Amino acid sequence: MKAYLDLMRHVLDNGTDKSDRTGTGTLSVFGYQMRFDLGKGFPLLTTKKLHLRSIIHELLWFLKGDTNIKYLKDNNVSIWDDEWADENGDLGPVYGYQWRSWPAPDGRHIDQIANVVEQIKKNPDSRRLIVSAWNPALVDEMALPPCHALFQFYVADGNLSCQLYQRSADIFLGVPFNIASYALLTMMMAQVCGLEAGEFVHTFGDAHLYRNHFEQAALQLEREPRALPVMKINPEVKDLFAFKFEDFELEGYDPHPHIKAVVSV
């Protein structure tokens, strides 16, 4: 995961001081890209321990089209805890709703994920293999507008690759989760479409380090990356919406210890 440490170092060396919505303050750069070859291991950060259980459950929650935190809380996942949700646990029309039930002007609801699976199978050379979570008409109704806003798939030589555009990226806390989540989604999509996983390409708009994460970032940069783990996925699952938590097994994960940091809200 040298690419991730390079991003962190680049922002510390070249970032611009910016104010932000949370009042914390950041060092920020605009426009940056990382690439991960999924054939060389699962890109789960090794310079600090990550909670893979949360990453998997959140992705399954997105794919269900769910926007209530009950499923997450039932599975001890606190990514979208009560400070984001209303009194009923609802987050508004966030990721899952846009992915699975994008509202069209004529009253239809478009399942972008199902559509893109169908198109990958039927027309793999299409340049329209895109899913968007950024719906300008509904942004103000969301607990948090989508940070990972749009992703596109690409098929070449039997390999499926994915590029994510992330408009806003909390480098220390959020980005490691985003890398693992979209890498896993790419692997799942590849399996159900009869392809191999290719690359995950991570493109950023505003990539930033919060000021209250500088010490943690410095500690992480002192650590040497270790060998990437391997993600095993149940090969019997051929329906993207049939995956369960038990269908995933991580092998060979040997990270450095966890580093605590405060989320800026």
Curated annotation (Swiss-Prot):
GO terms for cellular component: cytosol. One of its GO terms (molecular function) is thymidylate synthase activity. The keyword DNA-binding does not apply. It catalyses: dUMP + (6R)-5,10-methylene-5,6,7,8-tetrahydrofolate = 7,8-dihydrofolate + dTMP. Gene3D superfamilies: Thymidylate synthase/dCMP hydroxymethylase domain (3.30.572.10). CDD domains: TS_Pyrimidine_HMase (cd00351). Homodimer. Belongs to the thymidylate synthase family. Bacterial-type ThyA subfamily. This is Thymidylate synthase. It comes from Neisseria gonorrhoeae. The gene is thyA.
